[in-house]
Amino acid sequence: MADLSVEFSGLRLKNPIIVASAEPSNSVENIRKCIDHGAGAVITKTIGDIPGMRKLTENSKYAILNDKGTLIRGKVPRSFVFYSRSGYVTEPEQDWISYLKETQAYAAAKGSHIIGNITSGTVAGWRGLARMVEDCGIPMLEVNYQCPHPAELAAGAEGVWLAQDPKVTAEVTRQIVDAVGIPVMVKLTPESNRITEIAKAALDAGAASVAVNSRFVGFAVDIDKAEPYIGGPAGVGGPWVKYITQRWVNEIFDRFGCDISGSNGIFDARDAIEFIMSGAKVMQVGSVLMLKGVEWLPKVIEGIDRFLDEHGYPDLAAIHGLASKRALKTPAEMLSMEPLYCEIDRSKCKYPTCDICVRMCFYDSLHFGEDRVVTTPDTCIGCELCYNVCPFDAIRMLPKSERAETLAAE
């Protein structure tokens, strides 16, 4: 059995799976369930001082879509689209003082942790909520910057989400970090083309880690009704988005080597492992728990353990950042990849019943012959598209250098 424990922002977690700030963590009872099912930590649903955002939660709406863009109707696909609109916890922030104390005591007894997720509309509010959470014995904060920026913080910044502007991100983060003694994690938003710059601003201002990322804002359409699902724009995420999220995890890890919590795109253990190899130390799961239940947590955790054992890895550190470290960084490195060409295994090829490889080749390297598919290695650029689409594993990719050596020998 592999060691799944991980050191993250000063906390020792028994495993890297954290329940994200969402409905599964919106009450004492739900948080207890997450802990009972093995979560390394649970992030509370956002505690905030903006009444309108609490009201929004009371009017939450969801549309869970499949690859056709229609409602899943109980059949949860591997790559669902989670389209929803919600807000903060429904209770006033002061009510959560007792909830936080109770859940932290319960978590500690089970070897888990509570992370308090907060947001505010003022500097004083951010600092006050941060202190409130710390005073309850909570060991870590996650700050949710996906809300309008208050006018008092920076002239001309009204209406700007905090995590879209590096200077504003640094300003607010510094205020929060200075107010407490516990580590602060900043949750980034994908609604920015400056995510790496925003991450640096947060880290330079004292953040212990970053969470990559919160959800996009999308617009989903029900074409049969000629109207948007759930009335209009809403948050959109799900497993389909993991490759975009992992792009930023990789980039931030490569640039700064900081502690990263991967979020938005995790369905199962495979996804979690991809995030770890991209550079995340821990992962946040949320939408899948809302569709599969918190009973899904042990499946993810056990799946990670099984993968490590099967591949001979002793612990998470052995795979942390592996893919990121092996990634090509520059166009020059990408152009230096060894040229390949395709070769067809006649014993496996089903031509003329199947001709998909020829139809998919746009470089005139595959042609129809009288009784077989004919390859033209000299024009093959080694893109591997034919290798991907062949349903019979009849195509293999070989180095052009080996072919040149063979021809020379002949």
Residues covered by each model-derived region:
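Short secondary-structure boundary segments
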Residues: K45-I47, Y145, S214, S287-V288
